[in-house]
């Protein structure tokens, strides 16, 4: 099923709520860029957002240990290591695994203009079936203008963190809230409940 209710294209299985997803392991970021700090920033931001959406925290160091044990490499260099979802589920006792790909993280400098582009893809897979439960992809382009290259570089670096935050907020807005969600929901108002 494809949906755009949250404003961004995403796919979600129709029976997501019935799947009973509570525990989500956040796999190390598949980083297609050369910046390891970007991958860390992205993963930390997603980790916090999942918690505030009502999914309990599974410490990243425990997840990283499992990737190190099973792949033989650290989580920062686990680019080619794709553990089966079932293996992660067995080791960690989770319901689903979220995979994240940092597709693009760059700034192009053209005279007095410097566009900064950040692109991310997220995919949530079920441990029980191995199928995709939810996925979304989002890009942000932030444009900067200035007369000196130094100031353009500074503006570009200052825009990365807000871009990551926007991407995470937008993509995860289409993921249903978890069972421990603390978000306030106003009561439904209907004409017949007023009387």
Q: Regions from the language model: what does each represent?
A:
Residues 29-31, 55, 63, 102-105, ...:
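Solvent-exposed coil/turn segments that connect beta secondary-structure elements
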């Amino acid at each position: 099923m494809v949906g755009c209710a949250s404003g961004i294209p995403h796919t979600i299985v129709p029976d997501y709520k019935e799947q009973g997803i509570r525990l989500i392991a956040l796999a190390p970021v598949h980083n297609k860029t050369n910046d390891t700090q970007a991958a860390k920033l992205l993963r930390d931001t997603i980790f916090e957002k999942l918690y505030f959406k009502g999914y309990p925290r599974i410490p990243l160091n425990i997840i990283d240990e499992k990737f190190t044990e099973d792949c033989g490499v650290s989580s920062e260099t686990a680019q080619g290591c794709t553990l089966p979802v079932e293996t992660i589920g067995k080791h960690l006792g989770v319901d689903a695994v979220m995979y994240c790909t940092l597709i693009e993280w760059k700034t192009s400098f053209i005279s007095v203009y410097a566009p900064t582009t950040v692109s991310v893809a997220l995919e949530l897979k079920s441990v029980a079936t191995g199928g995709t439960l939810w996925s979304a992809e989002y890009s942000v382009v932030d444009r900067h203008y200035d007369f000196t290259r130094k100031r353009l570089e500074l503006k570009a670096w200052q825009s990365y963190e807000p871009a990551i935050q926007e991407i995470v907020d937008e993509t995860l807005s289409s993921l249903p809230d978890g069972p421990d969600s603390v978000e306030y929901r106003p009561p439904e108002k209907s004409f017949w409940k007023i009387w």
